[in-house]
Amino acid sequence: MSSAARIVPTVLPASLLMALSACGGGGNTSPPSPAPPPAATGPVIPNGAPQVAGERRDKRVLVGEYFSLDAVAFAPRIVDPDGDVLRYQVVLRGAPGLAVAGTQVSGVFSTAGAVEVRVTGTDPDGASAESLFVIAAPAAPPGAPALPATPFLYADEGLALPDDFRNSSEFRIPLWDTQPPGNRTTDAGAALGRVLFHDRRLSITNTLACASCHQREHGFASPERFNTGAIGVPLARNAMALVNARYNAHGSWFADLRVLSIQDAAREALTKPEELGNTLPDLEAKLLATSFYAPLFDAAFGSPEITAGRILRALEQYVQALISYRSRYDAACDTVGGVAKDCAARLTQQEERGRQIFTDSSTHFACVHCHSLPSGSNVWFANNGIDAQFTDVGAGHGQFRPASLRNIALTAPYMHDGRFATLREVIDHYDHDVRASADLDPLLRDSNGNPVRLDLPESDKLALEAFLRTLTDHAMLSDPKFSDPF
């Protein structure tokens, strides 16, 4: 439309028009001129905003080779229901060195990389729609993985899980177990998931894998404050650790709780241009081009068919298998045969003092309220007072999901934005630097609304850090079934 609304004229009946033109009197007087019809009235039809029609498709080019394409012609088509002529704008994210002239994108990738192309179509009334695609110059794909003749044991049935992880009502871990009934971890399914998790084919550039941001030696977290994905743009948040992720309640995936399952999280990571950047159809095609994936899918799902749904299910099974239960804390405090161990007799005096501080639920401000043991995870989200004012609202009002404390000594940097480089900085925050705000979690406020702080002596700070280090699971992190097979 060329205006915000269109007026539909009202057509008057002929009899009414005749009555309006009838003579006003007798004699020789001339009849009056007909009265003009009333102004056209009718229903107001609102402007129809442009819409995107079609699915995203991406463009592959060669490293070192010049290319040029019309972004509007290549992108998913933007249509206007009113037939308005649209004005287009093309914006690039990533891949410095490429150029935009009008709607034409051109340039040369000097190394493997990718760029996100956003096309916005705007009608004369200012309504718009945006479509996007990715131009990628991929690296050569990796070779075949080295796999054992017999799959590793991943399913719960083959693991020596402590009682707390199997049937404890006190710690409620089974009640928090988010394995979907139709996709419980199997040995063959997680074996396929392990290959997918470490395969750089999962990125549009063949340069990144899930394991690039979730590194085994760092507790399946990242040592970087903000990782960069396929298009080379830093992500907005620190990558969270995946260990014991299956014990997060439904709805608690990502720091802002925005997705409902591991599969949803994997789909987002695979397809967002700022992460791995693929489309699921393109990913299916890449895996079909290999010789080794079909047998793995056959073993996992009963047929060699490679589908996006199966890719997501296998990744979910592998992440579900990332269970930490062999730390020094577990050896000291697990319940075995229904009998709880004496933690104090198995931890050092300093570590036991730290455990007491951590678990003392008689205090209003206890670590265990947000970081349950033994899983180290929690379902809650909270504003933990790192800022009095915030720009990242998280799940709302500056609230974020607490991280698992499993392997916490290895998962630095800390917080959703990676602002703290060491455990001591985290302890100091809760000790004396919790910031007051109207959104501060109630567990961190006293009855007057003031921030509650630990105010620990130095010896207790050291003890708390020593206890947190007992949650490192070296056995899990060195287990070959979680290693990179490529």
Language-model features and meaning:
Residues 1-12:
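Bacterial N-terminal signal peptides that target proteins for export
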Residues 3, 24-25, 32-45, 138-486:
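Periplasmic c-type cytochrome electron-transfer domains
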Residues 19-22:
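C-terminal motif of bacterial Sec signal peptides marking the signal peptidase cleavage site
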Residues 31-79, 117, 126-140:
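Extracellular interdomain linkers/hinges and stalk-like, low-complexity segments
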Residues 52, 83-106:
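Low-complexity "stalk/linker" and mucin-like segments enriched in Ser/Thr/Pro/Ala/Gly
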Residues 63, 111-112, 204:
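Surface-exposed loops/turns
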Residues 104-114:
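Extracellular/luminal low-complexity segments enriched in Ser/Thr/Pro
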